[in-house]
């Protein structure tokens, strides 16, 4: 239990901007971080949901409301996953060989492809949030999407082989086993039940769409890079969430 709590504290300090007391990082805590990843999603989702509610009450234009609501998940996570999204887009869209793509993936320089990709992402996310406000969509979707995406990404992260250059990815997955996978599956099943109870079959359909989107991202990255990494996880998470948000606009 102590190591699980340490894993949660490490996850909060790593994946959010929430100030946390100092915890010494070690492998015992690191191997529990992925089990806690859905909890990070719950925190992000709750902040997004509450932000949506509060901003929606402001006497400002729907355009400004949409912009403010759109950036909430990026702000609370310190742009961490957005950085991974940009790095992976830069590498894949370069159309180079595998070794060069891996070099681009690790390169801290911001390329043109990453900038173009994030602009497209922002346009789609802005439009989706605008639709949420305009058509009064169920805001609980904003609470559940970060949980669903992180749960699925965490499962793949401890299941798929990590890129050998990804030392951080290996650090998080070292010591994980079948028990961790079972816990993540049970967590996802619980989320599925709760999400389905709110949105019915539509909720289950959105969850499956997100799962397929993330699976395709992981499969593509495995083909391009030979494994998974923190950047790949961030890329898959961002794509999964925007696909889920877009699907919610279409089907709810």
From Swiss-Prot:
Keywords: Cell membrane, Cobalamin biosynthesis, Magnesium, Membrane, Transferase, Transmembrane, Transmembrane helix. GO terms for biological process: cobalamin biosynthetic process. It comes from the Bacteria. The chain crosses the membrane at residues 4-24, 38-58, 60-80, 113-133, 141-161, 190-210, 232-252. GO terms for molecular function: adenosylcobinamide-GDP ribazoletransferase activity; cobalamin 5'-phosphate synthase activity. Its cofactor is Mg(2+). It is a multi-pass membrane protein. One of its GO terms (cellular component) is plasma membrane. Pathway: Cofactor biosynthesis; adenosylcobalamin biosynthesis; adenosylcobalamin from cob(II)yrinate a,c-diamide: step 7/7. Its EC number is 2.7.8.26. It is found in: Cell membrane. It catalyses: alpha-ribazole + adenosylcob(III)inamide-GDP = adenosylcob(III)alamin + GMP + H(+); alpha-ribazole 5'-phosphate + adenosylcob(III)inamide-GDP = adenosylcob(III)alamin 5'-phosphate + GMP + H(+). Joins adenosylcobinamide-GDP and alpha-ribazole to generate adenosylcobalamin (Ado-cobalamin). Also synthesizes adenosylcobalamin 5'-phosphate from adenosylcobinamide-GDP and alpha-ribazole 5'-phosphate. Belongs to the CobS family. This is Adenosylcobinamide-GDP ribazoletransferase. It comes from Clostridium botulinum (strain Alaska E43 / Type E3).
